Structures are given as structure tokens and as C-alpha cells.
């Protein structure tokens, strides 16, 4: 019967008694997946790279010498060299950079000094921005750069991360209300090849050393390789501790959020930066629960910490501790402060929240005396906020308060803001201050700090222009910002919202949340933006709840992982979005409100069973009969669709077996043929009664399958033994005794004739026919034994006594005939036909016993005085015939005994005759005749009985 499985797809086997059955074994090793990963240290969602270009010009009515050019160079100092033991993947991936980068370029006629800033803000306008400050005379050219991009390709060979999936399914819990608190695992996150390098760098022509020019497009790059122990789990933490003169970010301050990504944008760890301790604490996501052997490398933009590293041309120890691994390097820092310049400004920092520019301007560092000083700030693309009261004017009382890093300690300055009137105009884009304030002359020095907020209405990239109009000349300084790579823009104060809801077990599989249905703990949930970039990930809590916080208006994607042992329920059932399932991937829109309707339901995946029966097919018909029993101890192996062994069992005492907890899918069942047994015929009848063969393919589709049977019968050896024993023994004994006694006084004639004839005929014929036909292992032994025993006994006794005085004639005739016939026929025919290993024993024993006894007794007594004639004739005939179809043996002894005594044969005269003796002689004669006749009758009678 072919293709007879209705619920299952199966392949039978062609029966062959010589088939060898084997179990295919599939080595499973843990599949390894190599994922090239470059870690990204990000600040926040949308981050930008800004370049600030500041140009200062001086219009002079008199000939004035310009400040000499200062060529500043920086040379990196390597304090230690670490061996690179990081494995690289097969494909290059971009190295990780800080998510924000800003470059500020300040330009004057004589010198450059860089200043770098890193910004992180998803809601404020700014990407890469270039500022240009201009005046009639250029004094300096300063660039302030920090890395604001989310991910930037670096020209160096990228390090990678190689990852393979974990085999275990560990479900860590990250509750919404109280995130899981893990263990510090600094000792389980290992860093190597740590380096702090200057990106670009400037060589000091005098010393030949490479210097870090903080306001001339230079940034620092922190690089390292790392490995993570497999024992690390979601919620565990590790730290980056930055030293006294070193911090993450650039001109733009580091964001509080510092996430760690792989090359595909998946979040490995979420970092929180604490500016007070200058430490970032990273918390691992469920990524480490899903993968093992995580290793890789990273590159992070960093900057000099301006409040501590304050002096130009000074070497500072840049130190960092990653986990438990510490590294430091001496780096020369230069901010490009020009002390002889009446007006100079710099971007102190860019706020990482609203991307506002926090500016510092130094006025009259040379301490010149002026009769006129009007300080004017013009903003393009930015605005002042008069209500913020962050326009500050400080009077300098000590020349040392003009620190090179443009981050003076304002607590040591004299705040004179209230002494001046700040006049805002041009829609708060212009601020004017008269620094003379009624004085006729003044040589006072000032430090002025301002905050400029991005203006969303502006279509250009923005700039900040400064002028100091004096009685001697008009000084100018300009900071302009241009986008290098795009970023979304929004107000810094935009409200944040939440997104999330619930993952539940849909026990009745109706696709709706019912009151009695509970949440599922430990489900992985990933949040992505509209471009598919991963923003965050979390794990459902013990109640099945999850939540993402701090989100702006927009469209998001939420992905749910399927928990082990579950199947996604039907999505989008009904019209109530609050109680349905949104499937494995859904889209959520935030528009001025939280969105807590993104749910997903799962039900426990049903498990099925497979198996049935292995039986002894005694009649070899390939069908299970009610009298046939199961076979115990048959090994049965189950393989999945890939050929991997997923289960092995043995049949029980009733021949039954089964495999449980199976998903719907394709499987192969392999029966191992028991020793000494032969596979029976397959697919001979109904599916639940036939044999399916040694290997059976089966498909389970939402049901159990208990029709997978197999039958065997015993292997036979044909041994045909035919034993025929035929023994024929014929014994014929004929004994004839004839005694004739005659006594005659005269004229006695005695004639004794004895005839004994014994005839024995024995015929033994043995015919044994054994026919054995055996296909395999046939042994035929035929032994024929035929025994026939024939016994013939003939006894004849004849006694004749004659006494005659004269003329006595005695005649005695004895005839003894013995006939014995024994016929024994033995025919043994054994026919054995065996396909294989058949043993047939045929034994035939034929015994024939024939006994023939013939006894003849003849007694004749004659007494005659005269004229007596005695004649005794004894005839003994014994005939024995034995016929046996086997082996015949005959033995016929014949012993005729006839004795005639003639007492008168020597007489010389005839018996006397006379009247006196006639009666006597006649009586004697007749007596003798009667005796002889009686003897003959008796003998003949016995002869008939024997026959």
C-alpha cells in the first residue's frame, strides 16, 4: 500500500531479508553565528557633528602690528603598548564613534587653536555646524570640534565583534516599575589594546611634538578591544571612569545617556554618565542573554576637561579605567588664547539637551584704556532668552582670571551685570551693552558669558557675531555653524512621552485579552525608530508589562520576541485596539500623549506524541493479528527534519514505544532490527495494522500519530532430517518328528517314508524419499531403518508303533505343511520447503513381526502278530514369505524328523498264518490305519491353522 498515510507523510521500506538497518547519527554542535560588530557609544537619539569657525578682524585707523603667529603642535605620548588579541570578523565594520561631534573654528590672522565640542540632542536643530567670526583684521583661526555623529566611518581598519547565539534561553526580568538591579561585573568585562589618540593633531614646529589643539578641529579618540564573559546577564553593570583631565564628548558635553551598540545598531548596554564623578555606568540589556562569546572593539570621542586642564602648552595625564583595566597617556593641550587681543570669544560648551551655545568672550585682555566701548552681539539662527537671565558681565580683577580654556572660575569674578543695561532688539537676536556706562575713560577688563538658543524659524546654519566698537578701532569676532550631517530638529523643551503596554498568555487562543488571562514574564521587546534604527530594548516584568520612556512625538516600531514554548496568537482581532494582539511587530505613533496600546499575545505551543508498536509477525503476513505479541527492547530513534537525533527509546514489554513533547513538523522514525529477526512485509493493510518498515518519514500537523508500527519474524534455518528404520527379520522353523515303531513276529514289512519340505521366502524393500528445499541454511539428513521380523515354527511329530507277530503291514504317512507369509511395507516421505532456517525432522520406524507355528503330531500304534504291514510316511512342508519395504532378514530353520523303526526287516520267515491269528491281525491292521488317518487329520488341521 503506497502513500497511505492520511495525516502523515511517510516513506516505507522495500522488504529484503538481507537488509541491514542502521541509525543515522547527526552531530550537533552548537551552531555558531559570526556577527561583525563595532560598538557605538552614543549619547542620544539624534546626534550631530558641529564645526565652529570663528574669525576675528580688527579695523585700525592707525598702523598696528598684528600678533605674531604661534605655531602650536601636539605630539601624542604613548605610556604603554598593549598586545592586540581581538579577533576580527570576515568583513570590515565601521568603528564606533561618539554620537555627537561639533567643530568650532575660530580664526584670526596669526594663529590657530582648536576647540572641539560633542553635542547630543534629538530635538534641537544642529548637526555639524561651522561658525565663522569675522572682523576687519584677522587675529586668530580657531576650530572647536567634537564628534556629534551617531556613527562615523573611520579610515582605520575597523575592529569587529564576533558573536554566536546562546544555546540556553535565559529570560531575565526588567520590570517597568523597578528595573532589575544586577551585579557589577567589571571583572568579567576585559579590555585590551587601550589607547588615547589625537585625531588630526598639530605638530609644534619648535618642539616637534604633536599637540592637542582643542579649538582647531582636534578631538581625542579613546580606543579599546573587549570581551564579555558568558556568565554576564541582563542587568549586570560595568563602568568607565575618566581621570581628572579627561572626559567623554567634545565641545558638546556628554549626554547623560551613553548607550553601547553593535555594528547593526542593537543595544548591548545602556550607559548613564555622571558628570559629578566623571563616570559612565553601563547596564547590560538582554542582548547578553541571547548571545555568547561576545567580543569586539570600540572607539569613543573624548575631550580635555576644561575646568581642570586650563593652561596652554601644558602636558596633562589623560587617564581612564575601563572595567578593571587602567590606561593613561600624557597629552599637550592648547586652547589658543591670545592674550594681546582686545576681543576674543570661544564656545565654552554646547549643551547636550537643547544644543544651546554657551559662549565666553574676553574683553580688553591687553588692558587698554578706552573712552568708548560698545559690545554688540548679533545672532543668526539663534535667539537670546531675556527671561533666562543668563547674560552675565564679570569684571576681571586679576589678570590670571583669563584662563586659556575659556572656563573661568566665576566665583572669583566680580559680577557687574546689574551695572549695565543689556538692550535686546531684532526679535531678541541682537544684544547691545555700553561698557563705559557714563565713564569718560576706562581700562577695565571684562569676561562676558551668554547663551544662544537655536531658532527653528531660521533657514540657515546659524552664526554668532561679536563687535567691540572703541574709540581706537572696531574689533570683530564671528562664530558660524554649518551642518556636516543632518539631524532632526526640535525645541529643547519638547515634552517626552511613554510607549508600551502588555504581553499576555492567550489561553483560549481567541486573540483577545480576557480578565482571567495573565501576563508573560521575560519577553524581549525592542524599540526602533521609523528608519529601523534600534533605540532601546527591555524585558517584560513578572506581570507581562513593559514600557519605553522619554520619547518624542513620532512613529516607532516595537518588536516582540516569541518566548520559548509559545506561539503568537491571532493578531488584530476585533475593533478594540486596547485588548487585541498587535502581533510580533507593530507600529506605534506618539502624538502629544502616551501610547500604551501596543500588546502582543501568545499561547502555549501544543505538544504532540508519536509512536505505537513493534510486534512478532509469526505468520509473516505483514499484519498485526490478535494472537501476535509485541517485541520488547527494540531500539527506536527519532530524528528531526535536519537529521538530528532528538530522541531514543526502547519498546516496553508489550512492544509499545512513544515520543512526547513534539512540535508540528517533519520527523523520521528508525527501528533497529533485533538480532535474529527478519523485517516483515510493509504497507500490506490498514495503516494502524501494517508494518511501516525500518525507516519511516512522518509529518505531524496538529495531531498525535500512533500508527508507526513495524513487524519482524524469526529467521529460520532449514534442517530436514528424515529417519526411516526398517528391520525385517524372518525366522521360519519347521520341525517334523515322525516315529514309527513296528513289531512283527513274522512277515512284517515296514516302510517308512519321511518327506520334509521347508520353503522360506523373505523380500525386504525399503523406499525412503526425502525432499528438502531450503533457500538458506538447509541441512537435510535422511535415515531409513526398516525392521521386519518373521518367525515361522512348524513342528510335526509322528509316532507309529506297530507290533505284529506275523504278516503285519503297518503304513504310517505323516504330512506336515507349514506356510508363513510376512509382508512389511514401510514408506517414509519427508518434504520440507523452507525459505530460511527451517528445521524439519521426520522419523519413520516400521516393525513387522511375523510368527508362524506349525505343529503336527502323528501317533500310530500297530500290533499285529502276523501279516502286518506298517508304512509311515511323514511329509513336513514349511513355507515362510516375508516382504518388507525396508530391510528384510530371514531365518528359516527346518528340522524334519521322520523315524521309522522296522523291527521285522531282519525276519527270515513270513508271519505265521492261521485261523487263530486272523482276527488279531485284522484288528491290528485296522487300528493302525485309523491311527494313521487320525494323525493325518490332526496334522492337516494344524497346518490350516498356521496358514
From Swiss-Prot:
Chain segments carrying region Disordered: 51-164, 678-927
Annotated signal peptide: 1-50
Ligand binding A region: region residues: 51-495
InterPro entries listed in its UniProt record: Adhesin_Fg-bd_dom_2 (IPR011266), Adhesion_dom_sf (IPR008966), Fibrogen-bd_dom1 (IPR011252), Ig-like_fold (IPR013783), LPXTG_anchor (IPR019931), SDr-like (IPR050972), Sdr_B (IPR033764), SDR_Ig (IPR041171)
Residues recorded with modification Pentaglycyl murein peptidoglycan amidated threonine: 913
Name of a matching Pfam family: SdrD_B
Annotated membrane topology: Peptidoglycan-anchor
Cellular component, GO annotation: extracellular region
Biased composition regions of type Low complexity, renumbered to the chain: 912-927
Biased amino acid composition, Basic and acidic residues: 72-83
Short motif (LPXTG sorting signal): ranges: 910-914
Keyword Nucleotide-binding: no
Single biological process term from Gene Ontology: cell adhesion
PROSITE patterns reported in the protein's UniProt record: GRAM_POS_ANCHORING
Keyword Secreted: yes
Domain CNA-B residue range list: 496-606, 607-717
Swiss-Prot/TrEMBL keywords: Calcium, Cell wall, Peptidoglycan-anchor, Repeat, Secreted, Signal
Composition bias type Polar residues, residue spans: 56-71, 84-155
Gene3D superfamilies: 2.60.40.1280, 2.60.40.1290, Immunoglobulins
Compartments where found: Secreted, Cell wall
Placement of sequence motif YSIRK-G/S signaling motif: 21-32
PANTHER family: TOL-PAL SYSTEM PROTEIN TOLA
Role according to the record: Cell surface-associated calcium-binding protein which plays an important role in adhesion and pathogenesis. Mediates interactions with components of the extracellular matrix such as host NRXN1 to promote bacterial adhesion.
Subunit structure: Homodimerizes; via N2-Domain. Interacts with host NRXN1; this interaction mediates bacterial attachment to host cells.
UniProt similarity note: Belongs to the serine-aspartate repeat-containing protein (SDr) family.
Name of the protein described by the UniProt record: Serine-aspartate repeat-containing protein C
Source species: Staphylococcus aureus (strain Newman)
Lineage: Bacteria, Bacillati, Bacillota, Bacilli, Bacillales
Amino acid at each position: 500500500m503506497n502513500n497511505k498515510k492520511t495525516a502523515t507523510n511517510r516513506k516505507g521500506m522495500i522488504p529484503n531479508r538481507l537488509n541491514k538497518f542502521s541509525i543515522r547519527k547527526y552531530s550537533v554542535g552548537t551552531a555558531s553565528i559570526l556577527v561583525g560588530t563595532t560598538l557605538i557609544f552614543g549619547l542620544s537619539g539624534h546626534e550631530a557633528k558641529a564645526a565652529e569657525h570663528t574669525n576675528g578682524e580688527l579695523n585700525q585707523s592707525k598702523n598696528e602690528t598684528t600678533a605674531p603667529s604661534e605655531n602650536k603642535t601636539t605630539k601624542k605620548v604613548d605610556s604603554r603598548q598593549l598586545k592586540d588579541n581581538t579577533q576580527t570578523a570576515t568583513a570590515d565594520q565601521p568603528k564606533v564613534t561618539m554620537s555627537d561631534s561639533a567643530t568650532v573654528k575660530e580664526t584670526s590672522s596669526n594663529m590657530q587653536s582648536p576647540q572641539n565640542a560633542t553635542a547630543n540632542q534629538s530635538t534641537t536643530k544642529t548637526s555639524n555646524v561651522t561658525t565663522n567670526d569675522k572682523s576687519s583684521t584677522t587675529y586668530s583661526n580657531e576650530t572647536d570640534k567634537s564628534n556629534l555623529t551617531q556613527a562615523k566611518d573611520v579610515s582605520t581598519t575597523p575592529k569587529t565583534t564576533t558573536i554566536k547565539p546562546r544555546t540556553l534561553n535565559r529570560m531575565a526580568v526588567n520590570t517597568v516599575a523597578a528595573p532589575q538591579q544586577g551585579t557589577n561585573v567589571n571583572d568579567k568585562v576585559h579590555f585590551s589594546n587601550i589607547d588615547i589618540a589625537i585625531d588630526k593633531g598639530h605638530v609644534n614646529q619648535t618642539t616637534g611634538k604633536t599637540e592637542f589643539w582643542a579649538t582647531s578641529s582636534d578631538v581625542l579618540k579613546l580606543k579599546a578591544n573587549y570581551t564579555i564573559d558568558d556568565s554576564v546577564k541582563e542587568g549586570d553593570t560595568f563602568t568607565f571612569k575618566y581621570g581628572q583631565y579627561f572626559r567623554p564628548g567634545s565641545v558638546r558635553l556628554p549626554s547623560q545617556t551613553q548607550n553601547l551598540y553593535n555594528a547593526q545598531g542593537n543595544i548591548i548596554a545602556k550607559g548613564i554618565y555622571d558628570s559629578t564623578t566623571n563616570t559612565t555606568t553601563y547596564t547590560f540589556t538582554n542582548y547578553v542573554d541571547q548571545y555568547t562569546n561576545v567580543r569586539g572593539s570600540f572607539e569613543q570621542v573624548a575631550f580635555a576637561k576644561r575646568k581642570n586642564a586650563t593652561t596652554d602648552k601644558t602636558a596633562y595625564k589623560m587617564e581612564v579605567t575601563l572595567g578593571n583595566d587602567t590606561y593613561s597617556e600624557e597629552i599637550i593641550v592648547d586652547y589658543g588664547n591670545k592674550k594681546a587681543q582686545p576681543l576674543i570669544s570661544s564656545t565654552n560648551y554646547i549643551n547636550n539637551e537643547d544644543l544651546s551655545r554657551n559662549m565666553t568672550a574676553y574683553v580688553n585682555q591687553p588692558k587698554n584704556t578706552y573712552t568708548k566701548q560698545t559690545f554688540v552681539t548679533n545672532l543668526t539662527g539663534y535667539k537670546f532668552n531675556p527671561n533666562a537671565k543668563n547674560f552675565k558681565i564679570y569684571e576681571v580683577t586679576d589678570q590670571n582670571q583669563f584662563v586659556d580654556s575659556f572656563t573661568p572660575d566665576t566665583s572669583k569674578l566680580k559680577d557687574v551685570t546689574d551695572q549695565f543695561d543689556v538692550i535686546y532688539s531684532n526679535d531678541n537676536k541682537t544684544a547691545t551693552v555700553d561698557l563705559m556706562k557714563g565713564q569718560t575713560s576706562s581700562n577695565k577688563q571684562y569676561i562676558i558669558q551668554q547663551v544662544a538658543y537655536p531658532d527653528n524659524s531660521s533657514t540657515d546654519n546659524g552664526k554668532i557675531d561679536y563687535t567691540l566698537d572703541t574709540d581706537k578701532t572696531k574689533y570683530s569676532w564671528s562664530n558660524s555653524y554649518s551642518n556636516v550631517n543632518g539631524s532632526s530638529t526640535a525645541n529643547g523643551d519638547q515634552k517626552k512621552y511613554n510607549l508600551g503596554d502588555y504581553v499576555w498568555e492567550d489561553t483560549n487562543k481567541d486573540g483577545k485579552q480576557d480578565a482571567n488571562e495573565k501576563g508573560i514574564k521575560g519577553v524581549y521587546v525592542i524599540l526602533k525608530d521609523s528608519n529601523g534604527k534600534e533605540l532601546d530594548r527591555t524585558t517584560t516584568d513578572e506581570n507581562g508589562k513593559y514600557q519605553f520612556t522619554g520619547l518624542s512625538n513620532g512613529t516607532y516600531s516595537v518588536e516582540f520576541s516569541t518566548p520559548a514554548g509559545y506561539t503568537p496568537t491571532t493578531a488584530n482581532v476585533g475593533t478594540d485596539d486596547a485588548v487585541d494582539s498587535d502581533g510580533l511587530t507593530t507600529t506605534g505613533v506618539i502624538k502629544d500623549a502616551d501610547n500604551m496600546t501596543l500588546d502582543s499575545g501568545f499561547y502555549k505551543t501544543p505538544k504532540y506524541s508519536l509512536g505505537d508498536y513493534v510486534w512478532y509477525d509469526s505468520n509473516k503476513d505483514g499484519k498485526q493479528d490478535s494472537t501476535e505479541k509485541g517485541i520488547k527492547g527494540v531500539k527506536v530513534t527519532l530524528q528531526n527534519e535536519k537529521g538530528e537525533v532528538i530522541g531514543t527509546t526502547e519498546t516496553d514489554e508489550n512492544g509499545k514505544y512513544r515520543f512526547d513533547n513534539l512540535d508540528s513538523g517533519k520527523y523520521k522514525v528508525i527501528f533497529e532490527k533485533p538480532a535474529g529477526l527478519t523485517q516483515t512485509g510493509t504497507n500490506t493493510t490498514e495503516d494502524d495494522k501494517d508494518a511501516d518498515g525500518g525507516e519511516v518519514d512522518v509529518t505531524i500537523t496538529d495531531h498525535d500519530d500512533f500508527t508507526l508500527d513495524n513487524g519482524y519474524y524469526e529467521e529460520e534455518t532449514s534442517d530436514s532430517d528424515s529417519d526411516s528404520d526398517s528391520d525385517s527379520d524372518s525366522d521360519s522353523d519347521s520341525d517334523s518328528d515322525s516315529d514309527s515303531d513296528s513289531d512283527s513276529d513274522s512277515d512284517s514289512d515296514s516302510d517308512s517314508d519321511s518327506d520334509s519340505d521347508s520353503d522360506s521366502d523373505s523380500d525386504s524393500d525399503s523406499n525412503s524419499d526425502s525432499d528438502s528445499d531450503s533457500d538458506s541454511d538447509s541441512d537435510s539428513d535422511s535415515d531409513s531403518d526398516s525392521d521386519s521380523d518373521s518367525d515361522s515354527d512348524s513342528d510335526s511329530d509322528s509316532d507309529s508303533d506297530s507290533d505284529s507277530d506275523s504278516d503285519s503291514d503297518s503304513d504310517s504317512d505323516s504330512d506336515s505343511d507349514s506356510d508363513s507369509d510376512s509382508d512389511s511395507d514401510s514408506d517414509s516421505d519427508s518434504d520440507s520447503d523452507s525459505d530460511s532456517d527451517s528445521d524439519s525432522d521426520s522419523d519413520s520406524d516400521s516393525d513387522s513381526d511375523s510368527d508362524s507355528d506349525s505343529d503336527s503330531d502323528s501317533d500310530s500304534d500297530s500290533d499285529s502278530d502276523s501279516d502286518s504291514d506298517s508304512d509311515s510316511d511323514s511329509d513336513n512342508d514349511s513355507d515362510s514369505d516375508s516382504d518388507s519395504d525396508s530391510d528384510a532378514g530371514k531365518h528359516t530353520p527346518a528340522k524334519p524328523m521322520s523315524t521309522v523303526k522296522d523291527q521285522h526287516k531282519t525276519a527270515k520267515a513270513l508271519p505265521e498264518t492261521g485261523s487263530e491269528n486272523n482276527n488279531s491281525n485284522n484288528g491290528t491292521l485296522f487300528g493302525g490305519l485309523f491311527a494313521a488317518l487320525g494323525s493325518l487329520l490332526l496334522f492337516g488341521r494344524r497346518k490350516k491353522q498356521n496358514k
